[in-house]
A protein has these predicted regions:
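Non-catalytic helical tethers at domain boundaries
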Residues: 1-197
């Protein structure tokens, strides 16, 4: 600007000059941190593909009956599992535990709670092997039963609210398969998907 407040022609920057100045200015923005993508294993992908999506088309009254029954079965399992944990040779408690998962499997499939049904079938199938003597009880197996029992109330609540499972049932299915094949329980799982999750 001159003394009269008029803009001097030489002071007017052309669009090209503005762009050039911007290009020369240092970039002060913090680069975005990229979250590493965890590649899902083929085993986990296969377990996931075997799971059917939940179906909420069943009559609401029937779904409510299932929710009530599931809560009762989970309460009973909460009593039986500690008894069996103390003495894993105690077959009465083990049969009761197996029956509880069998009930949840059947009723879950019937009302459209397929994620719960398949999770419980994976456990029931494994316990059948324990009962017929073809699969030995291990600390990992006991921990798996306890962990699955801990997860199920969340899945029951998810189904009641008609929302997608907030816990991945495919993890439980794969862990059961690993135990059946006498492999380390978390084979094929990312480190964050162990028994503590």
């Amino acid at each position: 600007y001159d003394d009269e407040g008029e803009r001097i022609a030489g002071d007017i920057e052309s669009p090209a000059q503005v762009l050039a100045t911007a290009a020369e200015a240092p970039n002060t923005q913090t680069p975005m941190t990229q979250t590493p993508v965890v590649q899902e294993s083929q085993a986990l992908a296969t377990a996931r593909q075997a799971l059917k999506d939940d179906d909420y088309s069943m009559d609401e009254d029937i779904r409510d009956i299932f929710i009530e029954e599931a809560q009762e079965v989970l309460a009973e399992l909460g009593e039986k599992i500690p008894v069996w944990e103390v003495d894993t040779h105690e077959l009465v408690a083990l049969k009761d535990i197996r029956r509880g998962f069998h009930t949840l499997k059947g009723s879950g499939r019937m009302v459209g709670a397929h994620q719960i049904g398949e999770m419980c079938w994976a456990v029931e199938n494994m316990l059948n092997r324990v009962l017929d003597g073809t699969l030995a009880v291990s600390d990992a197996l006991v921990g798996f039963i306890k962990d699955t029992h801990r997860k199920l109330p969340t899945l029951v609540e998810d189904f009641q609210q008609q929302r997608a499972p907030s816990i991945d049932p495919a993890v439980t299915v794969l862990q059961a398969t690993n135990l059946l094949q006498q492999q380390p329980i978390n084979t094929g799982l990312p480190e964050t998907n162990g028994l503590d999750n």
